[in-house]
Amino acid sequence: MKKLSLAVFNTQPPHLYFGGVERRIVETAKRLLSKVDTRVYCGTKAGFKKTALVNGITFVPCFSTDALFPLDNWFFNKTLSRAVDAIKADVYEAHTVSGYGFLKALRKRKILKPFIQTIHGVLADEYAQSFRGDSPTFRAKLANLIMWQLSRIEGESAKNATLIVTVSKYSSEKIVQFYGVDKAKIRIVTNGVDTQKFRPAQDLGEIKHQIGISNKQCVLFVGRLIPRKGLPFLVEAAKHIVKERSETAFVVVGNGPLKNHLISYLEKINLSGSFVFLGDVNEGMLAALYNCADVFVFPSIQEGLGIVLLEAQATAKPVVAFDVGGVHEAMLDKETGLLVKPDSRELADVILRLLSDRSLRERMGRKGRVFVSSNFSWDVCAQRMLQVYREALGDIA
């Protein structure tokens, strides 16, 4: 059978960034190399200027900007809208709102090509939830306001797409609720995790020493530093935690518009010595950091699924998260971790409970790895996406 040609659109270059969306693109494409010729069209960020071939996947730069989301996305889509004749494929797939410019140009010219919109977190839902937490910086407030406009674009793209893929039942319901899309167009394909890369490891003293947390218990957060990810809740919880367990280190992986505000606030409340901000890290370092953690905390106030929850559980770590969105689909409450309502004091209480009970941490960690290994596989994700591509083409067997 002839290989299917697929054009994927994503603002961030997946071979240079290690966010959940980017990992999904790479892991899926790697597993479909024999059946799908994937070309990923992505923004010119992090110095990405020339077409690259990595692990059999072609990455093509399209002019954007190094500015933060959503400005980078706007420039990227402007570039794509002018490239309809240049980008040829059997099927097109856009992640989040990274391809609306291309889709709009296709429809305007009445070119009926299969177009799949993959929605990870529903932007209209994200906007609705964004005012539950603080948005203390001008840039964060501006991003929330622009999110409203982007949610309208996402809704329009969802209506015009051939099929919609999303990562959880929760997100599927929100797409119907906010965008009025026919449920029959939606396919749920959950994210996966590479349980060989993310697995329990021992002897991580060197890593802990390297980041300055030797002989301390580690509470780990991984995610973008934006209001939706809820890091201010963890900062407030830390006030209570350090009173009872002063030798606790809070390690933060990721970047975003809240970073400088959070650092300033921690200095103001004399907690800067308890927090370590590492910025973005590569996949190998990320796996090591999961293993350094005693507890993984995910205080997001809106989430489609939460791939970092899967990775933490794959490394046999207990997870703590807010009971919002599709988070409950990514973990087992009271078995692989603990769910609480969005409240900093409740968050502090369950973190303290886990920090003080090693046997509970180990028991939940073991169950977490079994849960993820049994239910979240990139192999399954890739095969289901292949079915979606073929369905969009109309030739599914």
Which residues does each predicted region cover?
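Nucleotide-activated donor-binding/catalytic signature segment of Leloir-type glycosyltransferases, i.e.
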Residues: 263-281
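Short hydrophobic beta-strand element within catalytic cores of glycosyltransferases
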Residues: 309, 318-321, 331
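Aromatic "clamp/platform" in nucleotide-sugar-dependent glycosyltransferases that forms part
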Residues: 301
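Short alpha-helical donor nucleotide-sugar binding micro-motif in glycosyltransferases
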Residues: 280-281, 288-293
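A conserved mid-protein helix/loop that constitutes part of the nucleotide-sugar donor-binding site
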Residues: 23, 27, 217-240, 250, ...
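Acceptor-binding helix/loop patch of EC 2.4 sugar-transfer enzymes
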Residues: 110-155, 196
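Carbohydrate-associated surface elements
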Residues: 170, 192
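Conserved acidic donor-binding segment of nucleotide-sugar-dependent glycosyltransferases
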Residues: 333-334, 338-345, 353-359
